Amino acid sequence: MLLLGLLLLTSALAGQRTGTRAESNLSSKLQLSSDKEQNGVQDPRHERVVTISGNGSIHSPKFPHTYPRNMVLVWRLVAVDENVRIQLTFDERFGLEDPEDDICKYDFVEVEEPSDGSVLGRWCGSGTVPGKQTSKGNHIRIRFVSDEYFPSEPGFCIHYSIIMPQVTETTSPSVLPPSSLSLDLLNNAVTAFSTLEELIRYLEPDRWQVDLDSLYKPTWQLLGKAFLYGKKSKVVNLNLLKEEVKLYSCTPRNFSVSIREELKRTDTIFWPGCLLVKRCGGNCACCLHNCNECQCVPRKVTKKYHEVLQLRPKTGVKGLHKSLTDVALEHHEECDCVCRGNAGG
């Protein structure tokens, strides 16, 4: 009887130890799974910093063969030059565990932009090779995760390369001072500026603000004459199709012209150098006679004034005289088709 009691007590203690061990093993698996979820790109224990100055590659372990199971690997590529970017190109031999419901849940490779933490992409399966990825700065992060089931082959290989910064053009169209340029070369340099302030800074770097302000001081001259001609209101009639043909056939339309060429002035520079004017254009497809013998010509021409900056060489000394002036350019108000042997189309 005593022996039977000892056997029962020993069995109970053994069962308790077995249950404790099983529970401990289960807790360890859960803890491992939890750690695996947290060991992302933010966990420095799994991150390997790779300093690069040229081309190279990284790949899954044992590439191009079956990669190991239950892994988390992170590479952070850092270019030596801070002004460059990094481009990633995936090898055509790409294959990881297939996605589930089009989501890469188990085995995948992921690329992250460290500057803002955004994920550029996550890929798995073997159907399509991922496209090229480019960093915003001089570093980029790559993460590879495999779970404990169904490893695949060949894994992945990523080739990295350095993208040099693009050379930006200088804001000044000419590095030479205005006094060293001929008038034609200076005209080309002046035309390249996009704002009046940039132009005056180039012409007078030491006193550009004074010169700019003096251009707009009130004078006794009437500057900036702008004569606007009202457009004739269109009368709607039943023959709408014919009116549309007239509208887009021989009609006044915008043309850009060079002021120097229009005024035949080679001794002066104007800014802006080109302006929009109305000039007759289009075809004469609906003329009454042979249309090949018809030409679209202006029927009414007017002069309109445009205020521009005028630059003229000073007499006897170096430098340019700067002033706002009005230039008169021809505008075509009305057009007509003139055919050979007939006054109208």
UniProtKB/Swiss-Prot annotation:
Q: What induces it?
A: Expression decreased by hypoxia. Up-regulated by EWS-FLI1 transcription factor in tumor-derived cells. Up-regulated by IL13 overexpression in the lung via STAT6 and EGR1. Elevated expression induced by coxsackievirus B3 infection in immunodeficient mice. Overexpressed in the renal fibrosis. Expression in the lung is significantly increased after bleomycin treatment. Down-regulated by retinoic acid and gonadotropin.
Q: Where is this site: Cleavage?
A: 225-226, 231-232, 234-235
Annotated region Disordered: where?
A: 24-45
Spell out the Basic and acidic residues composition-biased ranges: 34-45
* Residues glycosylated per entry: 25, 55
Q: Which GO terms describe its molecular function?
A: growth factor activity; platelet-derived growth factor receptor binding; protein homodimerization activity
Q: Which Pfam families match?
A: CUB, PDGF
Q: Which GO terms describe its cellular component?
A: cell surface; cytosol; extracellular region; extracellular space; nucleus; plasma membrane
Give its localization.
Answer: Cytoplasm, Cytosol; Secreted; Nucleus; Cytoplasmic granule
Where the record annotates domain CUB, the positions are 46-163
Where would one find the signal peptide in this protein? 1-22
Q: Post-translation: what modifications?
A: Proteolytic removal of the N-terminal CUB domain releasing the core domain is necessary for unmasking the receptor-binding epitopes of the core domain. Cleavage after basic residues in the hinge region (region connecting the CUB and growth factor domains) gives rise to the receptor-binding form. Cleaved by PLAT and PLG. Sumoylated by SUMO1.
Phenotype reported upon loss of the gene? Perinatal lethality. Mice have feeding and respiratory difficulties due to a complete cleft of the secondary palate. However, they have reduction of renal fibrogenesis. Mice lacking both PDGFA and PDGFC develop a cleft face, subepidermal blistering, deficiency of renal cortex mesenchyme, spina bifida and skeletal and vascular defects.
Q: Which CDD domains match?
A: CUB, PDGF
Q: Per the record's keyword annotation, is Hydrolase included, yes or no?
A: no
BP terms from Gene Ontology:
animal organ morphogenesis; bone development; cellular response to amino acid stimulus; digestive tract development; fibroblast proliferation; platelet-derived growth factor receptor signaling pathway; positive regulation of cell division; positive regulation of cell population proliferation
Protein's job: Growth factor that plays an essential role in the regulation of embryonic development, cell proliferation, cell migration, survival and chemotaxis. Potent mitogen and chemoattractant for cells of mesenchymal origin. Required for normal skeleton formation during embryonic development, especially for normal development of the craniofacial skeleton and for normal development of the palate. Required for normal skin morphogenesis during embryonic development. Plays an important role in wound healing, where it appears to be involved in three stages: inflammation, proliferation and remodeling.
Disease association reads: Involved in the development of myocarditis and subsequent fibrosis in the experimental model of coxsackievirus B3-induced chronic myocarditis.
**Record note on quaternary structure:** Homodimer; disulfide-linked. Interacts with PDGFRA homodimers, and with heterodimers formed by PDGFRA and PDGFRB. Interacts (via CUB domain) with PLAT (via kringle domain).
Q: What is this protein called?
A: Platelet-derived growth factor C
Taxonomic classification = Eukaryota, Metazoa, Chordata, Craniata, Vertebrata
